[in-house]
Regions:
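Flexible beta-edge/linker motif
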Residues: 30, 59-124, 133-157, 220
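Extracellular loop and loop/strand-boundary signature of outer-membrane beta-barrel proteins
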Residues: 241-245
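Short, structured interface segments
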Residues: 126-128
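N-terminal type II signal-anchor transmembrane helix
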Residues: 1-50
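Short, intrinsically disordered, charge-balanced linker/junction segments flanking boundaries
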Residues: 246, 250-255
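A short, amphipathic edge element
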Residues: 49-57
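Elongated, acidic membrane-bridging lipid-handling scaffolds
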Residues: 89, 131-240
C-alpha cells in the first residue's frame, strides 16, 4: 500500500469517527435530560400499559446500551383512584434495533423496592388482565428479563371470598426470562408469606409455558419446584375446601 493510500484511509477513518462522535453527541444532548421529553415519554408508557405513569426523576446513560433509570415511579390503576405499582427505582436497558419496527424491547427491567397490588374481582377478572390483551393501537412492549428486588406483592381475591382474601409476599425477589405470550419463561421466586399475622417462607424455581395470545392467560402451564416453611394452611382453606372430604385444616406446612 502506497503512502498516499494510507493517508487517504486514515482521513476516511477520521471522518467516520468524527461523524459518529457528532451523532452520539446529538443523541446524548437530546436524551440525557429526560425532563425535557417528559410528556412524550409518559405518553408512550401510558399507551403501552394503558395506565397513568408518573416518576420523580429520570436519567439515561450510554454505556454498552441505552440504560434508563427512574426514581419515585408510580403506576396508577386504570380507574386512577389507586396505585397499581409504586417503586423506589426502576432501571431498564433498551434494545435499539427493535425500535426500527416500532417495537419497544427491554433487554432487562429491574425494579427496586416495588409495591405491587393484584386484585381479582367477584367475576374472576384480574386487574392486570388488560395487559395481556392484543391491541393494534398499543405500542408493542416486551421485556426479555424482569428482576424484582426486595418487593412487596399483595393479592386480594374477591372471587374466592366476597369480602376479599388478601395474601402478601414480603421481601420478594424474582427473576423471569422471556415472559412473552406463546413462549416458555424460566423463573425464580423467593419471598416471605404474610397472612393472618403469621409468616412463612416460599421459594419456587421452574418454567412457565405462557399461553398464546388467542388463549386465556390462565390456561398457561407451570412446571416448578416448591420449597415452603411454616405456611399457614388454614388461610387458604377457601381454595381447596371443595376438594377434600373433611373439615378445615389448621397448622403449618413445610415441604
Amino acid at each position: 500500500m502506497t503512502k498516499k493510500k494510507k493517508i487517504t484511509l486514515l482521513l476516511a477513518a477520521a471522518v467516520v469517527a468524527l461523524a459518529l462522535a457528532v451523532l452520539a453527541g446529538m443523541i446524548a444532548t437530546r436524551f440525557l435530560n429526560l425532563d425535557t421529553h417528559r410528556e412524550d415519554l409518559l405518553h408512550a408508557l401510558r399507551t403501552a400499559l394503558d395506565r397513568e405513569v408518573l416518576y420523580r426523576e429520570g436519567s439515561l446513560s450510554f454505556r454498552l446500551q441505552p440504560t434508563f433509570t427512574f426514581t419515585g415511579v408510580v403506576i396508577r390503576e386504570k380507574d386512577g383512584a389507586s396505585d397499581f405499582i409504586t417503586a423506589d427505582r426502576v432501571t431498564f436497558k433498551l434494545a435499539v434495533l427493535p425500535l426500527l419496527k416500532k417495537n419497544v424491547v427491554l433487554r432487562r427491567l429491574e425494579m427496586e423496592n416495588p409495591r405491587i397490588h393484584l386484585i381479582r374481582d367477584r367475576s374472576g377478572i384480574f386487574n392486570i388482565g388488560n395487559l395481556f390483551e392484543e391491541k393494534k393501537d398499543r405500542i408493542a412492549l416486551k421485556a426479555r428479563r424482569i428482576i424484582i428486588r426486595n418487593g412487596r406483592l399483595s393479592f386480594t381475591d374477591r372471587q374466592i371470598l366476597p369480602e376479599g382474601l388478601t395474601t402478601t409476599l414480603e421481601n420478594l425477589d424474582l427473576r423471569i426470562d422471556h415472559p412473552e405470550r406463546g413462549r416458555k419463561a424460566a423463573f425464580r421466586i423467593s419471598a416471605t408469606v404474610d397472612d393472618e399475622s403469621k409468616s412463612g417462607k416460599l421459594a419456587l424455581a421452574g418454567t412457565l409455558d405462557i399461553s398464546g395470545s388467542t388463549e386465556p392467560i390462565l390456561s398457561s402451564r407451570i412446571d416448578t419446584s416448591i420449597r415452603a416453611e411454616r405456611l399457614n394452611v388454614g388461610w387458604y382453606w377457601p381454595y381447596y375446601s371443595r376438594y377434600v372430604p373433611f373439615r378445615k385444616i389448621t397448622g403449618q406446612l413445610d415441604m
